[in-house]
Swiss-Prot record:
Source organism per UniProt: Mus musculus (Mouse)
InterPro entries: DUF3719, FAM149
Main location: other
Biased composition (Polar residues): 54-74, 524-542, 557-567
Positions of the UniProt region annotated as Disordered: 22-81, 410-439, 486-578
Quaternary data: Interacts with TBC1D32; may play a role in cilium assembly.
Biased composition (Basic and acidic residues): 43-53
Protein name (record): Primary cilium assembly protein FAM149B1
Keywords of this entry: Cell projection, Cilium, Cilium biogenesis/degradation
Function: Involved in the localization of proteins to the cilium and cilium assembly. Indirectly regulates the signaling functions of the cilium, being required for normal SHH/smoothened signaling and proper development.
Organism lineage string: Eukaryota, Metazoa, Chordata, Craniata, Vertebrata
Localization in the cell: Cell projection, Cilium
Length: 578
């Protein structure tokens, strides 16, 4: 047994030189070849002789000195299988004979099939094959052999015959007599993915049990729940619509399936091409309109007219009229802007916007301007009536002062300018005129111990400061002449006295009281004379000399202007230096 593993395969050249006799001595030849050939002759003489001739021609040992039968029997497996080591094995003779018999039978079967299909020759094997095919067709109706296979089948596809006579039931029943043997193909049951396809009744086999047209719904055995996820191009849409093809088509479009059919592809391409052209034109028109509108708002009137003019040669410009350019707003409806830079910017900012819009040219007014005008007009009516100054009590003044102080300075000056033609600013008073309007004994009294009391009362303003708005009784001209004669006696005086003299003189009668309160830069400062207990004398000083305030302000020099300016900002602290 050990020597089996040391043997090598005998080459073909050595076998041809005479080693076959040595192999024959160890393995005597049994006479079985004649028995095999006799069994083949019982089935058909022509088939066995033809198969033996084919095997003999294919055998590579036909050139040996021995006969054809001896060479095949010496190496039976080499002629059939090609394994050369089986000739030297003790147990290989039986295996080789079985392989040889099986090979010869299969080869004879294929030869008979080829003769039947291509040469129309009938034999014993061919008759057996026909009976077997009929049994297969009756037992397995889903797969039948009809003829020649044209294309390679794939899952989900079916082959259609060239003529309807090829799939008739009579041809299936009598397959060996009536069917066309030149056509070879595989026909099976088609999966009905489309609802428009109606299965033909000729597809059903004759040997099947009558199911009544529900062959696809027949369930042989089922257990449990099976879920299948299939992906295919076309869905059965008539299950929910019951034959309404229009609703099925609309529902298919809503499902979002990609356009597979050539018609849908062409439709989508045409729509995309048309949409691109229309959208490009629409974007061009919108670009022209937007550019003309916004550039017109940012530029002045002359450049605005040039930019907003439509270009007739542009392909994106529609046939429409030019935008309406509204006229300028009359100056009577525009508030005065000469005194306030903020109002000038606001009024000039509205003018370019009007030219590009189809709106009425109304200048925007501030929110508090109408309220201020109403309050100021109410004050004018109350002041012009006799005895109406007492109506302006302390409960109205502080609230209105807080409300009007938050507004802009330009709005107050504009409303005052419309009512008061004279200038609003208070120019500094010269020293000579200020001395002429204030008596000397009053200045000596103001220098006294009343200054600390004034500093204390300025921290919390007293309602007595509003008392000078009341109407004053008339004063005789004798006292006026006496006081005017006493004025020029003291021409040289300090700046503190000049400020007191200026504070003793009331502003112009046309100037309103609220302007003096809200405009501290342009009005005179509060002094200690406002808090004197002698109201009668203070009122006489305030009302007797309105004619001396104007020439004093008009002839003021730069020296007096510089001296009074810091005093008006400093308050009572700067007046106590002397």
């Amino acid at each position: 047994m050990i020597s089996r593993y040391t043997r090598k395969a005998v080459p073909q050249s050595v076998e041809l030189k005479g080693l076959t006799k040595h192999a024959l001595n160890h393995h005597p030849l049994p006479e079985r070849l004649d028995d095999i050939s006799s069994t083949n002759n019982s089935h058909g003489k022509d088939t066995s002789s033809h198969s033996e001739s084919d095997i003999t021609q294919e055998s590579p040992i036909t050139s040996t000195d021995t006969g054809n039968s001896n060479s095949r029997s010496a190496f039976p497996s080499y002629a059939g299988t090609g394994v050369s080591t089986e000739g030297s094995s003790d147990f290989s003779w039986g295996y080789g004979e079985l392989d040889q018999n099986a090979t010869e039978k299969v080869q004879a079967m294929f030869t008979a099939i080829d003769e039947l299909l291509y040469e129309q020759q009938l034999s014993a094997h061919t008759q057996g094959l026909q009976k077997e095919c009929q049994q297969w067709a009756a037992s397995f109706p889903h797969l039948r052999i009809l003829g020649r296979q044209i294309i390679t089948p794939s899952e989900g596809y079916g082959l259609y015959p060239r003529s309807p006579s090829a799939v008739s039931a009579s041809h299936e029943a009598t397959l060996s007599q009536e069917r066309e043997s030149t056509i070879f193909g595989i026909r099976g049951k088609k999966l009905h993915f489309s609802s428009s396809y109606k299965p033909s009744p000729t597809i059903k086999a004759s040997g099947l049990c009558a199911v009544g047209g529900e062959e696809a719904d027949c369930i042989i055995f089922s257990e449990g729940v099976i879920e299948e996820y299939l992906a295919f191009d076309h869905t059965d849409m008539e299950e929910g619509f019951h034959g309404n093809k229009s609703e099925a088509a609309t529902e298919k479009q809503k499902l979002g399936y990609p356009p597979i059919a050539p018609f849908h592809c062409m439709k989508e391409d045409v729509l995309a091409h048309v949409f691109d052209n229309v959208w490009s034109k629409a974007v061009g028109c919108m670009e022209q309109l937007t550019r003309s509108h916004w550039e017109g708002c940012a530029s002045d009137d002359e450049s605005n007219v040039e930019i907003t003019r439509l270009d007739s040669g542009s392909p994106y410009v529609l046939n429409e009229q030019h935008p309406l350019v509204l006229p300028r707003v009359p100056q009577s409806k525009v508030p005065s802007i000469t005194s306030s830079p903020m109002s000038f910017c606001q009024a000039s900012g509205h003018q370019p916007n009007v030219s590009g819009l189809l709106i009425h040219g109304m200048p925007l007014q501030p929110r508090n301007l109408s309220l201020m005008d109403k309050l100021l007009d109410l004050d004018d009516k109350l002041l012009t009536r006799p005895g109406s100054s007492s109506v302006l009590s302390n409960r109205n003044w502080p609230n209105r002062a807080m409300e009007l102080s938050t507004s802009s300075l330009s709005y107050t000056t504009q409303s005052a300018r419309r009512r008061n033609p004279p200038p609003r600013t208070l120019h500094p008073i010269s020293t000579s005129h200020s001395r002429a309007g204030t008596p000397w004994p009053v200045e000596e009294i103001l220098r006294g111990p009343r200054v600390p009391v004034t500093a204390d009362t300025l921290s919390s303003p007293s309602p007595m400061t509003l008392g000078r708005n009341n109407l004053l009784p008339p004063i005789g001209t004798v006292e006026v002449e006496h006081l005017s004669a006493m004025g020029p006696q003291r021409p040289t005086k300090s700046h503190g006295d000049s400020s007191r003299a200026r504070s003793a003189v009331v502003d112009e009668p046309n100037q309103q009281p609220q302007e003096r309160l809200l405009l501290p830069v342009f009005s005179r400062p509060n002094t200690t004379q406002s808090f004197l207990p002698d109201t009668q004398y203070r009122s006489s000083c305030a009302s007797e000399y309105p004619h001396q305030a104007r020439p004093g302000r008009g002839s003021a020099g730069p020296q007096s202007h510089g001296s009074t300016k810091p005093q008006s900002r400093g308050g009572p602290i700067s007046r106590t230096r002397q």
